[in-house]
């Protein structure tokens, strides 16, 4: 008893779905029959659906429709091939976009408009590349030439970089072998060089000129030259400072900062 109740419950649940499926199939078959006939008025669509569902005792219209459907079955593969052909069109467009890249992005709207204005016939599909070349002129050729020029320019840049690196390496090798060229190029700044006697004399002169500025020494010989050059400015400044003989008395009065730096502050 419980199994019977369960079966009835399942039938009640699945019944509306099955009826809807049967109705949909019947209406689709009857619509196909009326479409296949030269004169659709020869078949009553409502009567055909009701006979298919079993609501009418007469089955004349439904039998005629079934015979027509059986005769039209060989024509279905042709429809299937047309659908396959329609599905293959997006794949072909995807391959074209993948192949020509920037050209499709640049001139895509123009090509689409041309396709709408001048649709391609089935006989012309075999020679698609020639027709594209004739239809779109030199656009595709120009794009290919641009790609070739970019590739050539990148190769040329690589060659220039490689030659520059080789030249720099050879130059460094020659510079390591020849120390005189390095000294001429960098002037001894990059590495320490042995000074000639002439350079030693110049260094001594520089030491004499600026050395006493950092330590307490007497007035140099070139004091008169500076005196002539700067007029009475240095003279007035020197007169304002105490002499060396008065250093002891002056050291008692000067601040501790002047004691620390000595002649640097007094000069």
From Swiss-Prot:
Annotated positions of the Phosphoserine modification: 251
**Gene Ontology, cellular component aspect:** axon terminus; cell body fiber; chromaffin granule lumen; dendrite; endoplasmic reticulum lumen; extracellular region; neuronal cell body; neuronal dense core vesicle lumen
Q: Name one GO molecular function term.
A: neuropeptide hormone activity
PROSITE patterns tied to this protein: OPIOIDS_PRECURSOR
Question: Site annotation (Cleavage): which residues?
Answer: 111-113, 133-134, 214-216, 218-219
* Compositional bias annotation for Basic and acidic residues: 163-175
Q: Give the signal peptide range.
A: 1-24
Annotated propeptide span(s): 196-207, 217-227
Q: Identify the stretch(es) annotated as Disordered.
A: 163-182
Question: Pfam families attached here?
Answer: Opiods_neuropep
All disulfide bonds of the chain are 26-48, 30-52, 33-65
Can you tell which superkingdom this protein's organism belongs to? Eukaryota
Post-translational modification comment from the UniProt entry: Proenkephalin-A is cleaved by CTSL to generate Met-enkephalin. The N-terminal domain contains 6 conserved cysteines thought to be involved in disulfide bonding and/or processing.
Compartment(s) of residence: Cytoplasmic vesicle, Secretory vesicle, Chromaffin granule lumen; Secreted
**Keyword set, alphabetical order:** Cleavage on pair of basic residues, Cytoplasmic vesicle, Disulfide bond, Endorphin, Neuropeptide, Opioid peptide, Phosphoprotein, Secreted, Signal
GO biological process terms, semicolon-separated: aggressive behavior; behavioral fear response; cellular response to cAMP; cellular response to oxidative stress; cellular response to transforming growth factor beta stimulus; cellular response to virus; cellular response to vitamin D; chemical synaptic transmission
Q: Which family does it belong to?
A: Belongs to the opioid neuropeptide precursor family.
Q: Which PANTHER family match?
A: PROENKEPHALIN (PTHR11438), PROENKEPHALIN-A (PTHR11438:SF3)
Q: What is the protein's given name?
A: Proenkephalin-A
User: What organism, scientifically named, is this protein from?
Assistant: Homo sapiens
């Amino acid at each position: 008893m419980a199994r019977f109740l369960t079966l009835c419950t399942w039938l009640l649940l699945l019944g509306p779905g099955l009826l809807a499926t049967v109705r949909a199939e019947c209406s689709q078959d009857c619509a196909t029959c009326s479409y296949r006939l030269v004169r659709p008025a020869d078949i009553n669509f409502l009567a055909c659906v009701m006979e298919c569902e079993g609501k009418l005792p007469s089955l004349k219209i439904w039998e005629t429709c079934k015979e027509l459907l059986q005769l039209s079955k060989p024509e279905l593969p042709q429809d299937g091939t047309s659908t396959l052909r329609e599905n293959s069109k997006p794949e072909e467009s995807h391959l074209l976009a993948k192949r020509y890249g920037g050209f499709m992005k640049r001139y895509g709207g123009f090509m689409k408009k041309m396709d709408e204005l001048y649709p391609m016939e089935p006989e012309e599909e075999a020679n698609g590349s020639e027709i594209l070349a004739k239809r779109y002129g030199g656009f595709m050729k120009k794009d290919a030439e641009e790609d070739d020029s970019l590739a050539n320019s990148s190769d040329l840049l690589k060659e220039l970089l490689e030659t520059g690196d080789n030249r720099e390496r050879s130059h460094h090798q020659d510079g390591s072998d020849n120390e005189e060229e390095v000294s001429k190029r960098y002037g001894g700044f990059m590495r320490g060089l042995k000074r000639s006697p002439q350079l030693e004399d110049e260094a001594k002169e520089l030491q004499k000129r600026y050395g006493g500025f950092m330590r307490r020494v007497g007035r140099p010989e070139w004091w008169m030259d500076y005196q002539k050059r700067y007029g009475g400015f240095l003279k007035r400044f020197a007169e304002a400072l105490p002499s060396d003989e008065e250093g002891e008395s002056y050291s008692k009065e000067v601040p501790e900062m002047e004691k620390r730096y000595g002649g640097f502050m007094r000069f």
